[in-house]
C-alpha cells in the first residue's frame, strides 16, 4: 500500500469520525436542550450585574493575549525583523480567527505561514516551528490531563459515569512526555531545543485562562461549584472539542460541560446561560477586537510592504497565481473587518428593539417610545443595508452608517441608556470616520434589481423583527397587557417613512453635490486628436452639443459619453491613438468607479472586442450597419434600372440636387427649419447617437439639398465627415412629407454619386436595428428573443423593412454592439441608452 492510498484512507476515516461525532453530539445536545426552560434562562440573565458583564468581557478579550506568546517565541527563535507590538497585534488577529474556525488549529497555522513567511529566509524552519505550535495546543491539555490522572483536579463524578473518558485521559497524558522528548531531540533549530517546552507552558496557561473565564461565567450566574471539580470538567470538555475538529469545539465542548455540571447538581438553565456568556466573552469579544485591529493593521501599507519586501519573490505556476490574490485579499481586510463589525452591530441593536418595547409597555408616554422605536429600527435596518457598501469602500454607504449610528445612539440614550452600548457605538463611529477617509469611491452604482432586492430584504427583516418581538413578549406572558395603544401601533409604517426620508435626503445630496465632479475635456482637444489620428463614423457627433468628453492624460485619445441614471453611456469606440486606448479605458473606468457609475458602450464595432472584454464586459448585438463600397457602386446595368428611373423622375420634375458649403445664411437655415418641422410633425428629436436640427451643429459640415423648380428646398441631408478610410456618412435626412415622391431615395442616390465623384470609397447608410441577431439556436437567449422581435414585431417598428430598404444598395453589413458590465442587466442597460437617445 503506497503513501497516497494511506493518506486517502486516513482522510476518509477522519471525515467519517468527525461526521459521526458531530451527529452524535447534535442529537445528544438537542435531547438535553429540549428539557430546558428558556424563559427561566432569560430571567436569570436579567439578574446579572452589568458591571460583572463588563469585567467578564474584558477578561475574555484579555485572555487571548496569552496565545500571542506563541508568536513571540516564534519571532525570537527565527530572529524576525518585526516589532513586538506588531507581533502581538497580528497574533491576536490570528488567534481570534483560529478560535472561531480553527479546525483543530489548522486555520491558524495556515494564516501564520502566510503572514510570517515575509519576515524570514528559512521557510522550511518556519513551517517546522508552526507545526510545533499546532501540536503544543494539545500538549497543554496533556499537562492538565496529567493533573487529573494524579487527582490534583477532581473528576471522579464524571469518570464514574463515563468510564471511557478515563482511558482518553491516559492516552492524552502519555502524549506529553513523548512530545517533550521528541522536540528536544529533533528541534526545529538546534539553538532552541526548549521551544517545545515553552510552547507547552504557554498552552497550559492559555487553557487555564479559558477555564477561569468559564468559571467566572458560572460565578456571575450563581452556579457555584468547587474549582477543582470545575477545572476537571473543563479539561475533559476541551479535549472533546479539540478532537472533534468542529470549529471552536462548538457542540462537543458544550455537551460535556452541560453533562458535567448536571452531575454536580447545577440547574441546566444556569449552565446554558453560563455557556452562552462564555462563548460571547471568549470567542465573540476577541473577534470584535481582532476586527478592529484588522481595520488598522492591514490594508494599503501591508500590501505595499509585501510588494516591496526583499523576501517576497513570486513563485511560479500555482504559487504565483495564489500570491497574486494574496496581496489583494490582505488589502481588503480592513473594509471586510469593518463590514462585519457593522453587521454585528445592526444585529445586536435589532435585538435591543425588544428592550424599548418592553420599557414602553410599562410607561405611560407611549408616543415617545413609538417614535424612538421607529427611529431605532430604521437606523438598524440602514446599517444592515449598507454592509456591502462599507466593504466596497463607498463613502455614501459609510455616511448612511454614520447617520444610523448617531440615530441609534440618540434612541439608546433616551430609552435603555446602556453606557456599554453607547461606548461601542462611539468606537464604530470612529472606525467609520477612518474608513471614510480611506474610501476609494463616492458611491456604488444604483441598479433596479438591487433596489428591488433591498426592498424585499427590508420587508423580510422588518417582518422577522416583528415576529421576534411578538414571540418574545408572548413567551414572557407580556401579551396579557392591553397593547392596542402601545408602541407597536403603526410602527411598521413610521419605520418605512423614516427610512425613505433618510435615503432620499442622502441620495439627493450625493447626486446634487457630486454631479459637479463630472469632468469634461475641451472640444478643441478632441478636434486636435481627430485631425492627428483620424475619426470614425460617429466622430462628427462631437459637435452635437449633448455630450461630454474624456481624454487620456497625454491627450492622444478620447471618448464621448453622456451621464444618465448613474451610468456613463459612451457612444462608439474610443478615438485617437490606438496604443493609448488601454490607458484611456482604465482611467475612464477608474473615474466611473470612483463616482459610482456604470459604464455602457453603445454602437461599438467588433474591432476592439478584446479590449472591452478585459474590463469585465459582455456584449449584445444591436444590429448591423450598411456600409456601401463606392468603388463598386453604379446606377448602370439591368439590376440598377430602378435607381435610374428614380433619378430620371426627379429630372423630369426639374428637381435638382446640390451640396451647400457652410457658412449658411439665415434664409437658408429658415428653409431647412421649415422642412424639418413638417417632417417631425411635433415628434421629439432624438439625441446622442444622431444629430439634432441645430444651427451650430449643422454649420460644421456641408448639407445636401433637393430643390423644386421654384428653387424651394423640399428635402435635405446633413453630411457627417468621418476623417478616416476615405469614408463619409449622412446624419439628418428630412423632406416634406406632403410630397408623394421618393425623396429619401433621391437624397441617398445623389449623395452616393456625389461621394464617389469626390473620391470617397465608403458610404455609411446607418444601422438596421436587430438585424441578423439571434438567428441560430446556439445564440444566447436574449439574442434569440431580440431576433423574434425583429421577425414578428415589424408593425411596431419597421425592423425588417429598414434592412430590406438598405439591402437594395448592396451594402456590406458590419455588426454593432452594446457593451455592458457582466454583473449588469441587459434590459436595464438598453433602457438607459434609450433614455439618453430620447431625452436631451
Curated annotation (Swiss-Prot):
Keyword check for Cell membrane, yes or no. yes
Which residues point to the Cytoplasmic side?
1-8, 74-89, 150-161, 222-229, 293-337, 391-394, 437-450, 511-840
Q: Offer one example of a GO biological process linked to this entry.
A: phospholipid homeostasis
- Location(s) in or outside the cell: Cell membrane
Bilayer-crossing residues are: 9-29, 53-73, 90-110, 129-149, 162-182, 201-221, 230-250, 272-292, 338-358, 370-390, 395-415, 416-436, 451-471, 490-510
What does the record give as the reaction this protein catalyses? L-lysyl-tRNA(Lys) + a 1,2-diacyl-sn-glycero-3-phospho-(1'-sn-glycerol) = a 1,2-diacyl-sn-glycero-3-phospho-1'-(3'-O-L-lysyl)-sn-glycerol + tRNA(Lys)
Coarse class of the protein's main subcellular location: membrane
Any single GO molecular-function term of the entry would be: phosphatidylglycerol lysyltransferase activity
GO CC annotation: what is one? plasma membrane
So which stretches are on the Extracellular side? 30-52, 111-128, 183-200, 251-271, 359-369, 472-489
Keyword Cytoplasm recorded: no
Q: What does this protein do?
A: Catalyzes the transfer of a lysyl group from L-lysyl-tRNA(Lys) to membrane-bound phosphatidylglycerol (PG), which produces lysylphosphatidylglycerol (LPG), a major component of the bacterial membrane with a positive net charge. LPG synthesis contributes to bacterial virulence as it is involved in the resistance mechanism against cationic antimicrobial peptides (CAMP) produces by the host's immune system (defensins, cathelicidins) and by the competing microorganisms (bacteriocins).
Q: What is the similarity comment for this entry?
A: Belongs to the LPG synthase family.
Q: What is this protein called?
A: Phosphatidylglycerol lysyltransferase
Native organism: Staphylococcus aureus (strain N315)
State the encoding gene.
mprF
Amino acid at each position: 500500500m503506497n503513501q497516497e492510498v494511506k493518506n486517502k484512507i486516513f482522510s476518509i476515516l477522519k471525515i467519517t469520525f468527525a461526521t459521526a461525532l458531530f451527529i452524535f453530539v447534535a442529537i445528544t445536545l438537542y435531547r438535553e436542550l429540549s428539557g430546558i426552560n428558556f424563559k427561566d434562562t432569560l430571567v436569570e440573565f436579567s439578574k446579572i450585574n452589568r458591571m460583572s458583564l463588563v469585567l467578564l468581557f474584558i477578561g475574555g478579550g484579555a485572555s487571548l493575549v496569552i496565545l500571542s506568546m506563541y508568536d513571540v517565541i516564534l519571532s525570537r527563535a527565527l530572529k524576525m525583523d518585526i516589532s513586538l507590538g506588531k507581533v502581538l497585534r497580528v497574533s491576536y488577529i490570528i488567534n481570534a480567527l483560529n478560535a472561531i474556525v480553527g479546525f483543530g488549529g489548522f486555520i491558524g497555522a495556515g494564516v501564520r505561514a502566510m503572514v510570517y513567511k515575509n519576515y524570514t529566509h528559512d521557510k522550511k524552519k518556519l513551517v517546522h516551528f508552526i507545526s510545533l505550535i499546532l501540536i503544543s495546543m494539545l500538549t497543554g491539555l496533556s499537562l492538565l490531563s496529567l493533573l487529573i490522572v494524579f487527582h490534583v483536579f477532581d473528576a471522579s463524578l464524571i469518570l464514574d459515569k463515563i468510564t471511557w473518558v478515563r482511558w482518553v485521559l491516559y492516552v492524552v497524558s502519555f502524549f506529553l512526555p513523548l512530545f517533550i522528548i521528541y522536540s528536544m531531540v529533533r528541534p526545529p533549530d538546534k539553538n532552541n531545543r526548549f521551544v517545545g517546552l515553552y510552547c507547552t507552558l504557554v498552552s497550559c496557561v492559555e487553557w487555564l485562562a479559558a477555564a477561569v473565564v468559564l468559571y467566572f461565567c458560572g460565578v456571575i450566574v450563581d452556579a457555584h461549584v468547587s474549582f477543582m471539580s470545575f477545572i476537571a470538567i473543563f479539561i475533559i470538555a476541551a479535549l472533546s472539542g479539540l478532537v472533534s475538529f468542529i470549529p471552536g469545539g462548538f457542540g462537543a465542548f458544550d455537551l460535556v460541560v452541560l453533562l458535567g455540571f448536571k452531575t454536580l447538581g447545577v440547574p441546566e438553565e444556569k449552565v446554558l446561560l453560563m455557556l452562552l456568556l462564555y462563548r460571547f466573552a471568549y470567542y465573540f469579544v476577541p473577534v470584535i477586537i481582532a476586527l478592529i485591529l484588522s481595520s488598522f493593521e492591514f490594508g494599503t501599507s501591508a500590501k505595499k510592504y509585501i510588494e516591496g519586501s526583499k523576501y517576497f519573490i513570486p513563485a511560479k505556476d500555482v504559487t504565483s497565481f495564489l500570491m497574486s490574490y494574496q496581496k489583494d485579499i490582505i488589502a481588503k481586510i480592513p473594509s471586510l473587518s469593518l463590514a462585519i463589525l457593522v453587521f454585528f452591530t445592526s444585529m445586536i441593536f435589532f435585538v435591543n428593539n425588544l428592550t424599548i418595547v418592553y420599557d414602553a409597555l410599562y410607561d405611560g408616554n407611549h408616543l415617545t417610545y413609538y417614535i424612538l422605536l421607529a427611529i431605532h429600527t430604521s437606523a438598524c435596518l440602514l446599517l444592515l443595508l449598507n454592509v456591502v457598501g462599507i466593504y466596497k469602500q463607498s463613502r455614501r454607504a459609510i455616511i448612511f452608517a454614520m447617520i444610523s449610528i448617531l440615530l441609534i445612539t440618540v434612541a439608546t440614550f433616551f430609552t435603555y441608556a446602556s453606557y456599554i452600548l453607547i461606548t461601542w457605538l462611539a468606537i464604530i463611529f470612529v472606525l467609520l470616520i477612518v474608513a471614510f477617509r480611506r474610501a476609494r469611491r463616492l458611491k456604488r452604482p444604483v441598479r433596479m434589481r438591487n433596489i428591488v432586492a433591498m426592498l424585499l430584504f427590508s420587508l423580510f427583516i422588518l417582518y422577522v423583527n416583528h415576529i421576534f418581538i411578538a414571540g418574545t413578549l408572548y413567551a414572557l406572558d407580556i401579551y396579557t397587557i392591553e397593547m392596542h395603544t402601545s408602541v407597536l401601533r403603526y410602527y411598521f409604517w413610521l419605520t418605512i417613512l423614516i427610512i425613505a426620508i433618510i435615503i432620499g435626503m442622502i441620495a439627493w445630496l450625493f447626486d446634487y453635490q457630486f454631479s459637479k465632479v463630472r469632468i469634461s475635456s475641451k472640444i478643441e482637444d478632441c478636434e486636435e486628436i481627430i485631425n492627428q489620428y483620424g475619426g470614425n463614423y460617429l466622430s462628427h457627433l462631437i459637435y452635437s452639443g449633448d455630450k461630454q468628453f474624456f481624454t487620456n492624460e497625454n491627450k492622444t485619445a478620447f471618448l464621448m459619453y453622456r451621464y444618465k441614471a448613474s451610468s456613463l453611456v459612451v457612444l462608439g469606440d474610443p478615438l485617437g491613438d490606438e496604443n493609448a486606448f488601454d490607458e484611456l479605458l482604465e482611467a475612464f473606468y477608474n473615474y466611473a468607479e470612483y463616482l459610482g457609475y456604470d459604464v455602457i458602450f453603445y454602437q461599438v464595432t467588433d474591432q476592439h472586442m478584446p479590449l472591452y472584454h478585459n474590463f469585465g464586459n459582455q456584449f449584445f448585438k444591436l444590429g448591423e450597419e450598411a456600409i456601401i463600397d463606392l468603388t463598386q457602386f453604379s446606377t448602370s446595368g439591368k439590376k440598377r434600372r430602378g435607381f435610374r428611373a428614380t433619378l430620371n423622375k426627379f429630372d423630369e420634375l426639374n428637381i435638382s440636387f446640390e451640396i451647400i458649403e457652410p457658412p449658411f445664411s439665415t434664409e437658408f437655415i429658415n428653409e431647412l427649419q421649415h422642412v424639418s418641422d413638417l417632417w417631425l410633425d411635433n415628434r421629439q428629436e432624438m439625441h446622442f447617437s444622431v444629430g439634432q436640427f441645430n444651427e451650430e451643429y449643422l454649420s460644421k459640415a456641408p448639407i445636401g439639398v433637393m430643390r423644386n423648380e421654384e428653387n424651394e428646398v423640399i428635402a435635405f441631408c446633413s453630411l457627417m465627415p468621418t476623417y478616416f478610410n476615405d469614408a463619409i456618412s449622412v446624419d439628418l435626412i428630412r423632406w416634406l412629407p406632403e410630397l408623394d415622391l421618393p425623396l429619401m431615395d433621391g437624397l441617398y442616390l445623389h449623395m452616393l454619386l456625389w461621394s464617389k465623384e469626390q473620391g470617397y470609397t465608403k458610404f455609411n447608410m446607418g444601422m438596421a436595428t436587430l438585424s441578423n441577431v439571434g438567428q441560430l439556436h446556439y445564440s444566447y437567449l436574449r439574442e434569440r428573443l431580440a431576433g423574434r422581435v425583429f421577425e414578428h414585431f415589424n408593425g411596431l417598428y419597421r425592423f425588417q423593412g429598414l434592412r430590406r430598404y438598405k439591402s437594395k444598395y448592396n451594402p456590406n453589413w458590419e455588426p454593432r454592439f452594446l457593451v455592458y458590465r457582466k454583473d449588469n442587466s441587459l434590459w436595464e442597460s438598453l433602457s438607459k441608452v434609450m433614455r439618453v437617445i430620447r431625452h436631451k
